[in-house]
Structures are given as C-alpha cells and as structure tokens.
Amino acid sequence: MGWVGAIIAKELTDAGMNVVVLERGPDRDTQPDFAYPRVIDELEGSVHRKYLQSLAQETIAIRHNGTTSAVPMRRMGSFKPGTGVGGAGSHWSGCHFRALPEDFKIRSIMEQKYGKKILPAGMSIQDFPITYEDLEPHFDHFEYVCGTSGKGGIINGAQVAGGNPFEGSRSREFPLGPNPDYLGAEYFYKAANAMGYHPYPIPASNASGTYVNPYGCQMGPCNFCGFCYDYGCLNYSKASPNANILPVLRGRKGFDLRTMAQVMKVNLTPDGKMATGVNYLDAQGRETEQPADIVILAAFSLYNVHLMLLSGIGPAYDPVTKTGTVGKNYSYQNLNRVSLFFDETVHANQFMGIGGGGATFDDLNGNRNDPTKTGFIGGGIIWARQPGGGPVRGIATAPGVPGWGSDWKKGAKEAMRHSFYFEVQGSCMSYDDAYLDLDPNYKDGFGRPLLRMTFDWHENEIIASQYLVGKAQDMCQVLNPLAIKGDAKKAGSHYNINQYQSTHTVGGAIMGDNPKTSALNKYLQSWDVPNVFAPGANAFPQNNGYNPTGMVGALAYWCAKAIREQYIKNPGPLVQA
C-alpha cells in the first residue's frame, strides 16, 4: 500500500465506500518501524534491503531484445520496488515535481513542429489523453498533502522570481518554502548562473518547517540526517503514506487493511468483461477470495502490469504484429552522474543530506531542445542533490585512486569530506521493442510466470545522455575542481539491470484515447474490464525528465474523483470506445 493505495482508500472512504486494502508485506508505521536509532542502519536498509520486496518470492526476468531468453533478477539492482505498508512511498527520497505542460503532448508537439519523419523508426511515444490543466488541481492538492517545500515559478500566469520559469502555471505557492542549500547546491547555483541557466530549488516533500496537512497530519522540519532513500523517515519530515495519510485512515469505518496478503489474480466473470474480486494468499498461505464491485490495482507499476497479464485484463501486447495493449510502451529514466573532487578547503560533509533538497534547472528539459540540431527527442534536468551517504553505501573516489589499500583509504577519506556530485536525469522515450509480458520459462515463488522485461537503451537516449552530460561537465569546469569523474553512455551501451539507476519504471499499462493503442482510458479505467482501474506510473506512455511521484499522486486523485463523481452513480465505461 503505497501512495496510490493510500490516496484511493482515503478518497473512497470519504465517499462512504467500504475499502479493503490487500498489502503483500508487513504493516509499518513511523513508530516503531522508523524510530531512531533503529532505522539508521546502512547494512539493514541499503545492503540487506529490509524495505524492499523479496526477490526470492517475486522478481522479474530481463533481456535486451526479443531474440534472446530472459534471466531472472536475483539481486536488487537497477530499481527498488518497496513492500509493506507505505511501499516505495516510504523509502523514496522526496523529489516532488509536476510534469511540464508539453510533456502531456510530446508526440503532437514534435510532429507539428518538425514533421512526422522526426520520430525514429520504432519510437512509439503517445500523447496523454489529458492535459496539465486537467491535473493542476490534483498536483496542487498532493503537494499540500505532502507538505512540499519549494518555490513557485509561475503562479496564476505570473512569473515569480526564484522559481522555475518554464513550469506550468500553478494556482498557489508551495505549502512550505525551500529547504536550506547544502554546499553542492550553492556551487550548482554559481555554475548554472554563470552558464546562463535558470536554477531553482528542487521541489521536495521533505519539510523545511513545521506543517499540518489538510488531513490534520503533522510534519516536523527535516534535520538533514542523511537517511532518506532506502529508509523510512524517523522525524515525520519526509512525506509518506505512513505519515501523511494513514493516520486518518487507520481505525476509520469502512477501511480494512490486511497485511501479508499477496494478491494472486483478479477474478473475472465468465465472459471476461467484469471483475468479481481477487484471490489472495494470507500470512498462513491460505488462498482466499475477496469479492469486490471495483478493483483498484495499486501495486508498484511493474506489478500492476503483471496482474493484468495474469488475469487476462485486456489484450497482451504482441511486438511482432504491434497489436495488443497490456505490456506496451515500457520505459525508464536516463540517469548519469558527474562527481566533482576538491581540496581540503571545500567541506562537503556527505554524511549530511536531505532526500529531495538541492537545486536544478529546466533549460534543457521538455521541448527546449531542437532534435534537428541535438539529434534526440526529449530532454532532462541537471541537478545537485545530497541525500546522504556513508561508508556502507559506498564512497566514490577520485580518478586514479586504487580500489584497495592505504591509498584507497586516503582517497575515500578525502572524497567523503571534499566531494559532491551533479546528476543528469533525462527522459526516456518508448519503443515498439521495449515491453513487458509473461516469461515462458521462469515462475515466481507462487507458481506464476514471472513478468518479463524486454528493454535496452536506444540511440536517442544515448545521444541525449552524451549531450546532457556534456552540458553538466561544462558547468563543472566553472567551479575549477581538482578532478571530475563520470561519463555519458557510450554508443552501443546496454541497459545494466545490476547497477542501481532509478526506481522510475513506467509504462506497460498506459492511458490513452483509443482502446487499440492504450490499456486504460483517461480516467485510468481498463478499456476491457470497466470496474478495474490501474492508476500509477504504469499509465505513462513514456517518461519525461522528472521523478514520477508528483504525477502519480495527481493521477490517483484524478482517478478517485472520476470514481466518486461518475462511476459510482453510473457504473460502466467512463469513456466510450
């Protein structure tokens, strides 16, 4: 039960509905699960992966293309699906962006501006069936639920100094002001301004001050403990379902939370046109049927797709015929890092950190890159963040430092105290040959076919990586570091499932305006089984340059509003095919 599950449960119980939430993992709350000093254990959180799903029970199979056999992911690597109450919303960092207005209409904008031939062969990007303006009230509400700290750039159409001048217009300022800058962010502002960019504070759902959200949930100011990503917040400072929604849900009439409940499949009527409920395994391994009038798939994005494929909800995507919708347009995030190393006069103190704090700019994001000149479609942000580091999580040493011995110890000490990094987070387009389906060879711990991921980097994303990393390295030169470490993806680079990059997995059950090209309609409702809804990052037709959580939360509120105001009154398809 992550952000989507908590939001939907809150909204539907507000409407007087009875909601049963089935969570595959244990119950968790700030007290006692994230309490100090229990939670600040690098070995437990970042090595043993206490808050992540068990790959022994449930994992994915991965391959680069459709001509090879996939192999299961046996170690947590490229991304980190959560488990337990709070889901990935409890162990995220806190970066909280809104998608840009142009992100909703990327295909239309590209084709209108540059012609249809601008899209490379096999690129399958699609417009969202909704607009930024549709979601603005829900972006706003989610920020206020989360106590997001930041600085608006355009409020009610008027540009405001200090914010993002390229953002969509917002109806009001952030609920809290920006977090304090750490040293790397101060240097980032200096370099970005020198290059003519427009830096602004990263919107962060890490509270910069005391706050009470619209539900009455309290937050305290972040103390820069450095344990955001991989961990639950010990201080009620990082927004999470546990701290910002569940306190008003627990004990509420009509709300039934069942933990250690692994959903196996969605049950359908004999004609496959309606869901009747789900089957799940309880903590004792007993299979139970839970009837339901409405089924909301609120798992991690990959597993929403997995459940749809296992249950026969919608036609599975066929990469050969390009037909079917469930599994198509899987996408990811294009991430690269550049580390800067300084002498002893620059004290970075990497052990301090705030998950979403720092600085970024959008001058290279959205539609501000001309693909006829840069050679790629999309964009990205360059940012400075310091979410916290430590010896167990790893210390990036300067170029030339050996990997062992006394010289390594010296280099690690210098790097820990006198270095920081900038990151390039790029968009990732979708393609005909990047998709999700059921693996024919491997099964999970419950006897079900594993979800199979077919994905690799395409030339578009490799060129984008090289372009954006080049811009980041140009910024670094302004600061005169002793050394710079970090490279862009090289031509022919392959996706590496073993190396952590980002938990921003998107697509696979996308929203659209045509049942032949999308699994869900504009309200996140299945075209094929209208009492099944699947809000989440799985609905993105491709990925933009931002973290997806702000968009995921807004879509959950958008979906819940449609259920409350339309579906309950007149059950059935909310959009006619």
Regions found by a protein language model. Name each.
Residues 5-6:
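N-terminal Rossmann-fold NAD(P) dinucleotide-binding loop
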Residues 64-81, 85-92, 96-112, 119, ...:
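FAD cofactor-binding and catalytic pocket of flavoenzymes
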Residues 202-205, 224-228, 259, 264-267, ...:
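A glycine-rich dinucleotide-binding beta-alpha-beta segment and adjacent secondary-structure elements
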Residues 138, 151, 155-220, 368, ...:
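Patatin-like phospholipase A catalytic core
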Residues 26-51, 82-95:
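Conserved N-terminal glycine-rich FAD pyrophosphate-binding loop of Rossmann-like flavoproteins
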Residues 11-14, 18-21, 25-42, 251-252, ...:
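Glycine-rich loop(s) and the adjacent beta-strand/alpha-helix scaffold that form part
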Residues 30-34, 93-95, 102-107, 210-214, ...:
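Short, solvent-exposed loop/turn and secondary-structure capping segments
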